[in-house]
Regions:
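Solvent-exposed interaction patches of small proteins and small membrane subunits
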Residues: 1-113
């Protein structure tokens, strides 16, 4: 039985909320100095990227409504395959700049006010 595409949107929504929660109270230097927070945030971006990848395969019109979805999938691939060269500043920037509008779009797709 095929998965309901909204399930991938829900996965994205929940992972985005976790990123925001994990980063609450941190600035870039404190983020960079915490292995635990960095690992947690990176894992959530892996989930977001994989969910977007599956959404793009099974419901491309929904994926297209998520800002920068292709870039986030590429970012997920970099986290998975380029783990030895992750740029903490890039992760931080994506979390601070790119994630909020993406999360807002996903909320709208899910009908969350």
């Amino acid at each position: 039985m095929p998965r309901d595409p909204r399930a991938w949107l829900w996965d994205i929504q929940q992972a985005a909320k976790r990123v925001s929660r994990f980063l609450d109270g941190h600035d870039l230097p404190s983020y960079q100095s915490s292995d635990l927070v960095r690992s947690a945030v990176e894992r959530q971006f892996e989930i977001i990227g994989e969910a977007l990848s599956q959404l793009a395969k099974h419901s491309p019109e929904l994926a297209a409504a998520v800002p920068r979805w292709r870039e986030i999938i590429g970012f997920r691939n970099m986290l998975i395959h380029g783990y030895a060269t992750i740029d903490d500043t890039r992760v931080w920037r994506i979390a601070q700049i790119d994630l909020p509008p993406m999360a807002q779009a996903v909320d709208q797709l899910l009908g969350v006010p």
